[in-house]
Amino acid sequence: SSGIGLEISKALARRGYNLILTARSESKLISLASEISEKYGVKVDTITSDLSDQTAPNNIFNFCELNKYDISVLVNNAGFANPDKFHRTSMEDEERFIRVLGISVIALTKLFLNKMLYKRHGKIMIVSSVAAYAPPSVIQSLYGPIKTFMNRFSESLNTSYNYKGITSTAVCPGYTVTNFHTASGVQDEMD
Protein backbone atom coordinates (compact mmCIF):
# COMPACT_ATOMS: atom_id res chain seq x y z
CA SER A 1 0.00 0.00 0.00
CA SER A 2 3.08 2.22 -0.13
CA GLY A 3 6.67 2.38 -1.36
CA ILE A 4 7.79 -0.07 -4.02
CA GLY A 5 4.47 -1.95 -4.00
CA LEU A 6 2.55 1.24 -4.71
CA GLU A 7 4.82 2.09 -7.63
CA ILE A 8 4.53 -1.42 -9.09
CA SER A 9 0.73 -1.15 -8.81
CA LYS A 10 0.73 2.15 -10.68
CA ALA A 11 3.06 0.79 -13.37
CA LEU A 12 0.79 -2.21 -13.97
CA ALA A 13 -2.32 0.00 -14.01
CA ARG A 14 -0.68 2.30 -16.59
CA ARG A 15 -0.29 -0.81 -18.76
CA GLY A 16 -4.00 -1.58 -18.44
CA TYR A 17 -3.87 -4.37 -15.86
CA ASN A 18 -6.79 -4.71 -13.46
CA LEU A 19 -5.46 -5.10 -9.93
CA ILE A 20 -6.13 -6.97 -6.73
CA LEU A 21 -4.25 -5.27 -3.93
CA THR A 22 -3.56 -6.73 -0.50
CA ALA A 23 -2.23 -5.05 2.62
CA ARG A 24 -2.93 -4.90 6.33
CA SER A 25 -4.51 -1.44 6.30
CA GLU A 26 -8.04 -1.49 4.91
CA SER A 27 -8.34 2.31 4.84
CA LYS A 28 -5.10 2.68 2.86
CA LEU A 29 -6.22 -0.03 0.44
CA ILE A 30 -9.60 1.58 -0.21
CA SER A 31 -8.04 4.98 -0.79
CA LEU A 32 -5.33 3.56 -3.04
CA ALA A 33 -7.81 1.48 -5.04
CA SER A 34 -9.98 4.53 -5.67
CA GLU A 35 -7.00 6.67 -6.67
CA ILE A 36 -5.56 4.09 -9.10
CA SER A 37 -8.93 3.19 -10.59
CA GLU A 38 -9.83 6.82 -11.28
CA LYS A 39 -6.41 7.79 -12.63
CA TYR A 40 -5.78 4.77 -14.88
CA GLY A 41 -9.30 3.54 -15.70
CA VAL A 42 -8.73 0.00 -14.46
CA LYS A 43 -10.69 -2.15 -12.04
CA VAL A 44 -9.05 -2.39 -8.61
CA ASP A 45 -10.25 -4.76 -5.92
CA THR A 46 -8.79 -5.14 -2.45
CA ILE A 47 -8.40 -7.72 0.26
CA THR A 48 -7.19 -6.79 3.71
CA SER A 49 -4.70 -9.40 4.79
CA ASP A 50 -1.75 -9.87 7.13
CA LEU A 51 0.76 -12.27 5.61
CA SER A 52 2.11 -13.16 9.05
CA ASP A 53 -1.18 -15.06 9.49
CA GLN A 54 -0.69 -18.56 8.10
CA THR A 55 -4.22 -18.57 6.64
CA ALA A 56 -3.59 -15.40 4.58
CA PRO A 57 -2.30 -17.00 1.35
CA ASN A 58 -5.28 -19.36 1.16
CA ASN A 59 -7.68 -16.52 1.98
CA ILE A 60 -6.21 -14.39 -0.83
CA PHE A 61 -6.37 -17.28 -3.30
CA ASN A 62 -9.93 -18.19 -2.29
CA PHE A 63 -11.00 -14.53 -2.68
CA CYS A 64 -9.67 -14.58 -6.24
CA GLU A 65 -11.36 -17.89 -6.99
CA LEU A 66 -14.69 -16.76 -5.53
CA ASN A 67 -14.61 -13.64 -7.69
CA LYS A 68 -13.44 -15.62 -10.75
CA TYR A 69 -10.36 -13.44 -11.20
CA ASP A 70 -7.93 -14.64 -13.84
CA ILE A 71 -4.50 -13.86 -12.40
CA SER A 72 -1.84 -13.49 -15.08
CA VAL A 73 0.72 -11.58 -12.99
CA LEU A 74 1.54 -12.35 -9.35
CA VAL A 75 3.64 -9.76 -7.53
CA ASN A 76 5.07 -10.89 -4.19
CA ASN A 77 6.06 -7.68 -2.43
CA ALA A 78 5.44 -7.72 1.29
CA GLY A 79 7.76 -5.58 3.37
CA PHE A 80 8.74 -6.68 6.85
CA ALA A 81 11.69 -6.23 9.17
CA ASN A 82 12.23 -6.87 12.82
CA PRO A 83 12.68 -3.64 14.77
CA ASP A 84 15.82 -4.70 16.63
CA LYS A 85 19.04 -6.68 16.37
CA PHE A 86 18.79 -10.46 16.16
CA HIS A 87 19.83 -11.17 19.76
CA ARG A 88 17.13 -8.83 21.06
CA THR A 89 14.18 -10.20 19.08
CA SER A 90 11.97 -13.07 20.15
CA MET A 91 11.63 -16.32 18.27
CA GLU A 92 8.04 -15.27 17.52
CA ASP A 93 9.39 -12.13 15.83
CA GLU A 94 11.69 -14.25 13.66
CA GLU A 95 8.90 -16.70 12.79
CA ARG A 96 6.66 -13.80 11.72
CA PHE A 97 9.52 -12.41 9.63
CA ILE A 98 10.08 -15.76 7.88
CA ARG A 99 6.35 -16.25 7.35
CA VAL A 100 5.90 -12.84 5.67
CA LEU A 101 9.07 -12.78 3.56
CA GLY A 102 9.41 -16.50 2.87
CA ILE A 103 6.55 -18.86 3.53
CA SER A 104 3.79 -16.56 2.26
CA VAL A 105 5.72 -16.02 -1.00
CA ILE A 106 6.09 -19.77 -1.47
CA ALA A 107 2.43 -20.41 -0.59
CA LEU A 108 0.99 -17.70 -2.86
CA THR A 109 3.25 -18.77 -5.71
CA LYS A 110 2.27 -22.42 -5.30
CA LEU A 111 -1.44 -21.59 -5.24
CA PHE A 112 -1.44 -19.31 -8.29
CA LEU A 113 1.15 -21.29 -10.26
CA ASN A 114 -1.27 -24.17 -10.77
CA LYS A 115 -3.77 -21.82 -12.43
CA MET A 116 -1.00 -20.37 -14.60
CA LEU A 117 0.12 -23.85 -15.64
CA TYR A 118 -3.41 -24.68 -16.73
CA LYS A 119 -3.44 -21.57 -18.97
CA ARG A 120 0.21 -22.09 -20.01
CA HIS A 121 0.84 -18.42 -19.28
CA GLY A 122 1.80 -16.31 -16.29
CA LYS A 123 4.34 -14.00 -14.75
CA ILE A 124 5.64 -14.12 -11.20
CA MET A 125 7.57 -11.23 -9.68
CA ILE A 126 9.32 -11.54 -6.35
CA VAL A 127 10.52 -8.24 -4.94
CA SER A 128 13.81 -9.16 -3.34
CA SER A 129 16.67 -6.81 -2.50
CA VAL A 130 20.26 -5.98 -3.30
CA ALA A 131 20.79 -7.10 0.32
CA ALA A 132 20.85 -10.63 -1.11
CA TYR A 133 24.28 -9.78 -2.54
CA ALA A 134 25.57 -7.50 0.21
CA PRO A 135 27.72 -8.51 3.17
CA PRO A 136 25.71 -9.65 6.20
CA SER A 137 24.15 -6.86 8.21
CA VAL A 138 24.28 -6.26 11.93
CA ILE A 139 20.96 -4.46 11.59
CA GLN A 140 18.93 -7.28 10.03
CA SER A 141 20.63 -10.69 10.39
CA LEU A 142 17.97 -12.64 8.47
CA TYR A 143 17.00 -10.07 5.84
CA GLY A 144 19.85 -10.66 3.38
CA PRO A 145 19.76 -14.46 3.73
CA ILE A 146 16.01 -14.66 3.10
CA LYS A 147 16.36 -12.39 0.07
CA THR A 148 19.13 -14.69 -1.22
CA PHE A 149 16.69 -17.59 -0.85
CA MET A 150 14.00 -15.62 -2.72
CA ASN A 151 16.39 -14.97 -5.61
CA ARG A 152 17.25 -18.66 -5.89
CA PHE A 153 13.58 -19.60 -5.58
CA SER A 154 12.71 -17.25 -8.44
CA GLU A 155 15.55 -18.65 -10.59
CA SER A 156 14.35 -22.17 -9.87
CA LEU A 157 10.77 -21.30 -10.83
CA ASN A 158 11.94 -19.69 -14.05
CA THR A 159 14.08 -22.70 -14.97
CA SER A 160 11.35 -25.18 -14.05
CA TYR A 161 8.37 -23.50 -15.73
CA ASN A 162 9.61 -21.16 -18.44
CA TYR A 163 9.04 -23.79 -21.11
CA LYS A 164 5.39 -23.92 -20.01
CA GLY A 165 4.89 -20.18 -20.53
CA ILE A 166 5.46 -19.05 -16.96
CA THR A 167 8.30 -16.68 -16.12
CA SER A 168 9.62 -15.68 -12.73
CA THR A 169 11.70 -12.61 -12.00
CA ALA A 170 13.37 -11.50 -8.79
CA VAL A 171 13.66 -7.73 -8.64
CA CYS A 172 16.52 -6.53 -6.43
CA PRO A 173 16.19 -2.82 -5.69
CA GLY A 174 18.93 -1.05 -3.80
CA TYR A 175 18.33 1.11 -0.78
CA THR A 176 15.08 2.98 -1.37
CA VAL A 177 13.64 5.49 1.06
CA THR A 178 10.18 4.18 1.99
CA ASN A 179 8.05 3.82 5.13
CA PHE A 180 9.59 0.34 5.50
CA HIS A 181 12.90 1.75 6.73
CA THR A 182 11.33 4.04 9.30
CA ALA A 183 8.91 1.41 10.63
CA SER A 184 11.61 -1.26 10.91
CA GLY A 185 14.14 0.96 12.69
CA VAL A 186 16.67 0.46 9.89
CA GLN A 187 16.77 4.17 9.10
CA ASP A 188 17.70 4.98 12.72
CA GLU A 189 20.57 2.49 12.60
CA MET A 190 21.84 4.00 9.35
CA ASP A 191 21.68 7.62 10.55
Outline where the language-model segments fall:
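Canonical Rossmann dinucleotide-binding motif of NAD(H)/NADP(H)-dependent dehydrogenases/reductases
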Residues: 1-19
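Conserved glycine-rich Rossmann-like NAD(P)H-binding loop of the short-chain dehydrogenase/reductase
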Residues: 15-32
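Conserved NAD(P)H cofactor-binding loop of Rossmann-fold oxidoreductase domains
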Residues: 77-82
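Active-site helix of classical SDR
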Residues: 109, 146
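Residue(s) in the substrate-gating loop at a strand-loop-helix junction
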Residues: 129
